[in-house]
Amino acid sequence: MTNEYIPFLSKIKEIVKHTETEYTFRMTYVGEVRPGQFFEVSIPKYGEAPISVSGIGEDYVDLTIRKVGKVTGEIFELNEGSCFFMRGPYGNGFEKENYQGKELIVVAGGTGVSPVRGVISYFGEHPDEVKKLHTILGFKSPSD
């Protein structure tokens, strides 16, 4: 069993640049994780920041990060193949079974879309599992 309080080194598999200040980092990760959970990411000498999981794969997690401070600024300087520390996952996350057969309304904005992206994606791909899926998303500007 892994101790979620002990940081581990994770490698950047891929970087997707959405805007000048928002990137998605595909990080190596093997373990249980649910949409809505988050990791504490850290760069030694700069600190740590909580970042929500925006995507989950068999051997990775996606972290969509907005460049807003020292830690995220340093992460944005890294390249594919570079590493940073993570610990977690934390939070309860979203269990799809809680929403199956129901009308689902998802409201989110900005980088707050990241934690619910997995729920939207899953039920968007499996529409027969919910009565109806509504999404209301807000952003500062069209470029966001």
Predicted regions and their residues:
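FNR/FR-type flavoprotein reductase catalytic core
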Residues: 70-144
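Ferredoxin-reductase
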Residues: 2-82, 139-140
